[in-house]
């Protein structure tokens, strides 16, 4: 089986540096043993073995009779003869039941005959002292037993003549109990007192080979993982015995333990041909060196070893399906022996003690292996099925997440779930279930009437009839805390605010209430007036669609609604001659009211519209102040401009006096006029003033037949307006919306050239700014 091109290719013949590294590894292992089991666990065993072997060498008759001259050469010849016999006996170590196999006998008989040469044996791997000295170094220089001792220790086999002529290259290496084999895992020490699990050896042979057994085989680890508290550490995992294939046949009760490298090599060879492996690939597995498998024929290994491998190529996952319970039919003679049968049956089994898995992974693997084992038991029909099944089910029923909640917490969750089932009106809260159960009851009643069979009792959900208490949430409110958080809750875990109560007099409360009520009334009036405005705007469409006889009535309704709108704007009460401006000002202070007035002005009569314009001119500074944020007043400029073209000169003069708040006579010295200043600093007020001046000048120039009194009045108004414009600083003037074109000619008739240039500069500057 072990074929090499030359003796130099033998794996035992390596350099001294590699074996020196092995010696250092042995020293580290001894140090680990001392740290683990004490300093006296494995001390001095090799020395005692050396002394006993030295005594045996002295008692040998060959060593006593040899002389100093030719004694060394004769001793080497004698050792060569003994080693030749030893090699022949080792090559015959085949199990009896394997020799009875016809296939094996045919393979043995067809071997060519090779004559061994003593010279090659003396320098081969069978050399006793020198070869082993290169392997172990100075540590075993005087420890190796002689050939006679090894020969005496071998079990006696009956002589077989035809087998003596077999090829020497097929002879297996002898088993070694004291020196490690290259490629095999190192022998680990175990606690003292562990009973050895080895084959029975004669007491005398055992005393010769190992007088005091030091490295004994520990008990095999359990098939399934131990509890989490008893699992081994990574250092302890290294001490698991993994050399059961080294020089010992497999007992039927002990499954073989393969290292991950050996398992990978075995399974890797199966990828080439499913279920088969060549003898050369099998020979490279380091765990089989020196085992009984090494002495077998390569053809026999090719037929036998393939059965130990799984039929599918590649590795099988940890949690894959279990192997088939019934083995496939075999097309070959009976197997070699119980140790290979045991290897074949146990090789695919995963050993959880060879890897360090996560506790959760171990638990899942343990459950999967128990399920596989129960399936095999059910298929084979062996064992107490009832007890094993019940115990397995009890084990699976154990919930690792049980007892995580107290009984009080469970009751609390149950109450929450029951609260959802409480209903005073189940047809409303649980409509679909109630209808479904009614259909089931009707079906059961129909079956009972037909007599098909006994009535089936159906389970019905019984909801507790508990009266619901309607609870309306009323948050705590404090005076003066509008928009602030008043209470602390789960969603708002803040400190309650200190409600600040300000003491106010009754007059202040009454006045505030009046203002609030007045604003509400104003809003109501605006909404009513808007409704009238929409109806009036719709009358044009209704007028076009109506008949001739219906149109007068529509016109009357329209006039009536227009008067109602004017009354709502002015707030004129029955029997009151002149309404107050306060009501109109309240409407104009609201943005919606300003826009509504701009839409209503075209529908009003000239007198009504002039009254609205006059009221606006009188209260323009106050309206400008209220419109500072909205700036909606410019929307009134267009309807006011259209209105001015329908007003007479007297009305325009009066409007100009109201707008500028001028005194009755120009001769009186005019004090400071804040009213006019506010109008000139607003774009709507300045634009309205310029439009009035332009329209008045047009009327004066176009109608020369006007009375002199009106002309004098207009002239005085123009002088006062020009004086105010000259007094207002240039920076205080606002940007008007529109500037008439006839302003320069207008002022040229009332002021001299110097003042005219100054006004022209201001107006041009204003026009340029615009």
Curated annotation (Swiss-Prot):
Residues modified as Phosphothreonine: 178, 194
UniProt-annotated stretches for the region Region H: 389-448
Chain intervals for the UniProt region annotation (Region C): 449-770
Residue ranges with Pro residues bias: 324-337
Region (Involved in nuclear foci localization): 1-397
Biased composition range(s): Basic and acidic residues: 385-400
Region (Region N): 85-388
Main subcellular location: cytoplasm
Region: Involved in nuclear speckle localization, residue numbers: 398-770
Subcellular location: Cytoplasm, P-body; Nucleus; Nucleus, PML body; Nucleus speckle
Keywords: Cytoplasm, Methylation, Nucleus, Phosphoprotein, RNA-binding
A Pfam family of this chain: PAT1
Residues modified as Asymmetric dimethylarginine: 217, 223, 263, 284
Chain segments carrying region Disordered: 1-26, 315-344, 360-400
Residue ranges, compositional bias (Low complexity): 367-380
GO process annotations (BP): deadenylation-dependent decapping of nuclear-transcribed mRNA; P-body assembly
Entry-annotated residues carrying Phosphoserine: 177, 179, 184, 278
Sequence segments annotated as region (Involved in RNA-binding): 223-397
Motif segment (Nuclear export signal): 86-95
Residue positions where Omega-N-methylarginine is found in the record: 385
CC per GO annotation: nuclear speck; P-body; PML body
Family according to the record: Belongs to the PAT1 family.
Domain notes: The region C, also named Pat-C, is required for RNA-binding and mediates the binding with the Lsm-containing SMN-Sm protein complex and the decapping machinery. It folds into an alpha-alpha superhelix, exposing conserved and basic residues on one side of the domain.
Subunit note: Interacts (via region A) with DDX6/RCK. Interacts (via region H and region C) with LSM1 and LSM4. Interacts (via region N) with DCP1A, DCP2, EDC3, EDC4 and XRN1. Interacts with the CCR4-NOT complex. Interacts with the Lsm-containing SMN-Sm protein complex. Interacts with EIF4ENIF1/4E-T.
The protein's name: Protein PAT1 homolog 1
Species of origin: Pongo abelii
């Amino acid at each position: 089986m072990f074929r090499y091109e030359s003796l130099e290719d033998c794996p035992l013949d390596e350099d001294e540096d590699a074996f020196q590294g092995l010696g250092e590894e042995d020293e580290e292992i001894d140090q680990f043993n001392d740290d683990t089991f004490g300093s006296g666990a494995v001390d001095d065993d090799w020395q005692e073995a050396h002394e006993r072997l030295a005594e045996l060498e002295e008692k040998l008759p060959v060593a006593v009779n040899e002389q100093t001259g030719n004694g060394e050469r004769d001793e080497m010849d004698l050792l060569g003869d003994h080693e030749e016999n030893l090699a022949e006996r080792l090559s015959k170590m085949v199990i009896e039941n394997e020799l009875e196999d016809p296939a094996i006998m045919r393979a043995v008989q067809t071997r060519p005959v090779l004559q061994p040469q003593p010279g090659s044996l003396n320098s081969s791997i069978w050399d006793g002292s020198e070869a082993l000295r290169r392997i172990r170094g100075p540590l075993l220089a005087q420890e190796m037993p002689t050939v006679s001792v090894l020969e005496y220790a071998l079990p006696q086999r009956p002589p077989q003549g035809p087998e003596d002529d077999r090829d020497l290259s097929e002879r297996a290496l002898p088993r070694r109990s004291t020196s490690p084999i290259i490629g095999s895992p190192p022998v680990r020490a175990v606690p003292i007192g562990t009973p050895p699990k080895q084959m029975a050896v004669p007491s005398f042979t055992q005393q010769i080979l190992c007088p005091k057994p030091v490295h004994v085989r520990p008990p095999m680890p359990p098939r399934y993982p131990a509890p989490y508290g008893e699992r081994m550490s990574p250092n302890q995992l290294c001490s698991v015995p993994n050399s059961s294939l080294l020089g010992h046949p497999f007992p039927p009760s002990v499954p073989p333990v393969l290292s991950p490298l050996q398992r990978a090599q075995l399974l890797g060879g199966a990828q080439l041909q499913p279920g088969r492996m060549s003898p050369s690939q099998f020979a490279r597995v380091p765990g089989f060196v020196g085992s009984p498998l090494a002495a077998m024929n390569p053809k026999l290994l090719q037929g036998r070893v393939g059965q130990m491998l799984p039929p599918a190529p590649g590795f099988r996952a940890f949690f894959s399906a279990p192997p088939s319970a019934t083995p496939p039919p075999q097309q070959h003679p009976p197997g070699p022996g119980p140790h290979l049968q045991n290897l074949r049956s146990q090789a695919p089994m995963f050993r959880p003690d060879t890897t360090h898995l996560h506790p959760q992974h171990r638990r899942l693997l343990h459950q999967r292996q128990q399920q596989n084992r129960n399936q095999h038991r059910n298929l084979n029909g062996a064992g107490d099925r009832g007890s094993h099944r019940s115990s397995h089910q009890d084990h699976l029923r154990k919930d690792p997440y049980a007892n995580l909640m107290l009984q009080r917490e469970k009751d609390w969750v149950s109450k929450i779930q029951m609260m959802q089932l409480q209903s005073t009106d189940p047809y409303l809260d649980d409509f679909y279930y109630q209808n479904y159960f009614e259909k089931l009851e009707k079906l059961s009643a129909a079956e009972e009437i037909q007599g098909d069979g006994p009535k089936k009792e159906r389970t019905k959900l019984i909801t507790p009839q508990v009266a619901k208490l309607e609870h309306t949430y009323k948050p705590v409110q404090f005076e003066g805390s509008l928009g602030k958080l008043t209470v602390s809750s789960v969603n708002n875990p803040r400190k309650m605010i200190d409600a600040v109560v300000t003491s106010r007099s009754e007059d202040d409360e009454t006045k505030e209430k009046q203002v609030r009520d007045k604003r509400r009334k104003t809003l109501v009036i605006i909404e009513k007036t808007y409704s009238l405005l929409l109806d009036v705007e719709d009358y044009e469409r209704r007028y076009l669609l109506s008949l001739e006889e219906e149109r007068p009535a529509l016109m009357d309704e329209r006039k009536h609604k227009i008067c109602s709108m004017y009354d709502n704007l002015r707030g004129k009460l029955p029997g009151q001659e002149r309404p107050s401006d306060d009501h109109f000002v309240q409407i104009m202070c609201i943005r919606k009211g300003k826009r509504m007035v701009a839409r209503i002005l075209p529908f009003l009569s000239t007198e009504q519209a002039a009254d609205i314009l006059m009221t606006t001119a009188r209260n323009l500074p106050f309206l400008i102040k209220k419109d500072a944020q909205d700036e909606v007043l410019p929307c009134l400029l267009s309807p006011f401009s259209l209105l001015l073209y329908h007003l007479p000169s007297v009305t325009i003069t009066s409007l100009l006096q109201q707008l500028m708040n001028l005194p009755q006579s120009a001769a009186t010295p005019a004090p400071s006029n804040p009213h006019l200043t506010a109008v000139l600093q607003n774009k709507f007020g300045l634009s309205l003033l310029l439009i009035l001046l332009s329209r008045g000048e047009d009327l004066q120039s176009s109608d020369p037949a006007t009375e002199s009194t009106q002309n004098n009045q207009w002239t005085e108004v123009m002088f006062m307006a020009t004086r105010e414009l000259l007094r207002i600083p240039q920076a205080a003037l606002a940007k008007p919306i529109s500037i008439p074109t006839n302003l320069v000619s207008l002022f040229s008739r009332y002021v001299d050239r110097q003042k005219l240039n100054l006004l022209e500069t201001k107006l041009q500057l204003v026009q340029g700014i615009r």
